[in-house]
Amino acid sequence: THKLQLEGLFGPAYYVTTSKELMESGTLANLSIKCLVLDYDKQERQMVSKMSYQEEIDWIVRNEKRNNFIKNLVSDLKGNTLVLFQFVEKHGKPLYDMLDKLDRKVFFVFGGTDAVDREKVREIVEREKDAIIVASFGTFSTGVNIKRLHNIVFSSPSKSKIRNLQSIGR
């Protein structure tokens, strides 16, 4: 629901505390955000600039060099890592197949994964030190609390501020 609609119904928002204050008090874990911007060659940039938004997203998630970069990034990260994706067949499954070849426990969670199995994955990862969860935004961006999660990799582009903030809150 839009912020202005909520304010119209309930009045202005009252902020009791901030994320910074919660981190300083130890209620929230400290976090560090590292934004990596990939540089594509001129020919690729020109080609993509002529695409519609949906075609561009499709090109991004199917880009083999980009997905290989994500695989290498995740393999270099220490600790439990959550890799979030948007499209199961064209992005999540290929990423899972690439990451599953690593010498680490790798789990694949999407809308078709039974709720009991999702909970088992969460419990297993909380006992692990170096596991990888490849999960769709829809299943792991909201409502899931993983206590021993060290890294989140947003492998799919998302313009949604709320989705991004909720995903970071895992």
Can you name each region flagged by the protein language model?
Residues 27-29, 75-76, 123-129, 144-146:
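Conserved catalytic network of the ASCE P-loop NTPase/AAA+ motor domain
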Residues 29-49:
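Conserved P-loop NTPase
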Residues 159-170:
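Conserved SF2 helicase motif VI
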Residues 11, 75-80, 100-105, 129-130, ...:
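Short glycine/proline-enriched coil/turn segments at helix->beta-strand junctions
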Residues 82, 91-94, 104-141:
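Conserved helicase ATPase core of P-loop NTP-dependent helicases/translocases
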Residues 1-34:
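Post-DEXD/H (motif II) to motif III coupling segment of the RecA-like Helicase ATP-binding lobe
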Residues 13, 81, 133, 152-153:
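Short, well-ordered beta-strand core segments
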Residues 45-86, 90-101:
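Conserved interdomain hinge at the start of the Helicase C-terminal
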